[in-house]
């Protein structure tokens, strides 16, 4: 009888671990992160992501990633509500800190928004930066988590 209980408990623990590990993949979804960080409402058909760089390896949730976004008209209109180029000093410093790993393409006319997901710290630890290029209609999502 004790053996049956032990097996049941072990089975429940294993099932729980499987459910948690499957659910955590949801957090690795860059489209969901884009929507959450920037308060955007995007239909599945209105946003296609292309991964340009990603070094999220080893420890979960630590790394840098750059995605190119092809978005619909509704999302582009939302981008027009953001800060217009040039970047602020804070955004320039953030991009400079990542320049050894990844760089955005040259953009002359566009809009941008930076979200510090760990406010109150003096260092950049969890930051998302999205940049919209008006000339090409493309957007770029740059995320960093350390």
Positions of predicted regions on the chain:
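Intrinsically disordered, low-complexity segments
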Residues: 19, 56-57, 120, 126
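Extended Gly/Ser/Thr-rich low-complexity repeat segments
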Residues: 79-89
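Generic structural motif
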Residues: 6, 72-74, 135, 146
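Short amphipathic alpha-helical segments that mediate assembly, nucleic-acid/protein binding
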Residues: 3-5, 31, 91
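Non-membrane alpha-helical secondary structure
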Residues: 7, 26, 87-90
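Sec-dependent bacterial lipoprotein signal peptides
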Residues: 1-20
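Extracytoplasmic electrostatic interaction patches
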Residues: 88-146
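N-terminal export/targeting and maturation segments
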Residues: 22-81
């Amino acid at each position: 009888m004790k053996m049956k209980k032990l097996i049941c408990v072990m089975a429940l623990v294993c099932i729980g671990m499987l459910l948690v590990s499957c659910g955590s993949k949801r957090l690795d979804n860059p489209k969901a992160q884009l929507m959450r960080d920037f308060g955007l409402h995007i239909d599945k058909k209105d946003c296609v992501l292309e991964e340009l760089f990603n070094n999220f390896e080893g420890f979960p949730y630590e790394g840098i990633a750059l995605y190119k976004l092809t978005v619909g008209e509704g999302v582009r209109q939302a981008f027009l509500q953001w800060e217009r180029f040039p970047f602020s000093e804070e955004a320039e410093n953030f991009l400079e800190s990542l320049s050894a790993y990844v760089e955005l393409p040259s953009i002359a006319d566009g809009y941008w928004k930076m979200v510090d997901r760990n406010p109150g710290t003096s260092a950049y630890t969890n930051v998302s930066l999205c940049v919209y290029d008006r000339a090409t209609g493309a957007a770029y999502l740059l995320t960093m988590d350390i």
